[in-house]
Swiss-Prot record:
The keyword NADP does not apply. The keyword Transferase applies. Belongs to the RibF family. It comes from Rhodococcus opacus (Nocardia opaca). GO terms for molecular function: ATP binding; FMN adenylyltransferase activity; riboflavin kinase activity. Gene3D superfamilies: HUPs (3.40.50.620). This is Putative bifunctional riboflavin kinase/FMN adenylyltransferase. Keywords: ATP-binding, FAD, Flavoprotein, FMN, Kinase, Multifunctional enzyme, Nucleotide-binding, Nucleotidyltransferase, Transferase. It catalyses: riboflavin + ATP = FMN + ADP + H(+); FMN + ATP + H(+) = FAD + diphosphate. Pfam families: FAD_syn.
Length: 248
């Protein structure tokens, strides 16, 4: 069962078999709820592609961030090592016990595990947070859903995707705990395209930043983004678009 590892700039070149605290989850967006799961951990075990892209490909789940942004956010939160499971049909058949024994314990040398209360894993989703309690070598921390907002609704990636789809960027940013940023490819000096794998704000006019530069832009269907003023984007280059708020 191959697992790809990435060491953040603040991490260690080699883990040298030392025991670690491992946070496990998809962590799409690395929002405020996810950050509670990360507390006290130095390692993250996550998935790329997102499991739902394999288990339920239609309709396609729209992501809140790409791999690079996820790594950057995790690094800023003090995570030293990130292990990516290349989730596919084969991984979907791995039992919950094999997942714990062969990946969490044997590969990542975990002594502590932190997961959200609704975390499910293993073939057919039979693994739950309680599954980790079967292993005496592991201490398990289960984080309850974090609530935020007038209705005390739980923070979740699903909730944030709905806010983005409605163009409610400010509330999405509030739950993310930081900018809502996506990669985009310049197709002309003032036009960008965001891949359809990502959550795109509702068509409208937004204030934003492109690679840190303040702009106004308009989003359309199919991921097309147009800057409202002439710019000097270099064709076929990838830039980062950070949406700030909806203007119209």
């Amino acid at each position: 069962m191959p697992v790809a590892e990435a060491t953040t700039a603040t991490g260690l070149a080699s883990h040298n078999g030392r025991q670690s605290g491992v946070a496990i989850g998809a962590f799409d967006g690395v929002h405020l709820g996810h950050r509670q799961v990360l507390v006290g951990c130095d390692t993250v075990l996550t998935f790329d592609p997102h499991p739902m892209h394999v288990l339920a490909p239609r309709p396609a789940l729209r992501l809140l961030s790409d791999r690079r942004t996820k790594l950057r956010k995790l690094e800023a939160l003090g995570i030293r090592r990130v292990a990516f499971i290349p989730f596919d049909e084969g991984w979907s058949r791995v039992t919950a016990d094999d997942f714990v024994e062969r990946v969490v314990i044997d590969r990542l040398h975990a002594s502590r595990v932190s997961v959200g209360a609704n975390f499910r894993f293993g073939a057919h989703g039979v693994g739950t947070p309680e599954t980790f309690n079967n292993y005496q070598s592991l201490q398990t921390r289960v984080v309850q859903l974090v609530q935020r907002g007038p209705g005390a609704e739980p923070i979740s990636s699903t909730r944030i995707r709905k806010l983005v789809a409605a163009g409610n960027i400010e509330d999405a940013i509030d739950l993310l705990g930081g900018p809502f940023s996506l990669p985009a490819v310049a197709v002309s000096e003032s036009r960008l395209v965001i891949a359809d794998e990502f959550a795109l704000p509702a068509p409208g006019l937004y204030s934003a930043q492109v690679d840190g530069n303040a702009v106004s832009l308009r989003t359309f269907i199919e991921g097309v983004v147009e800057l409202t003023h002439p710019a000097s984007l270099q064709r076929d280059t990838t830039v980062e678009v950070s949406f700030l708020n909806r203007m119209a």
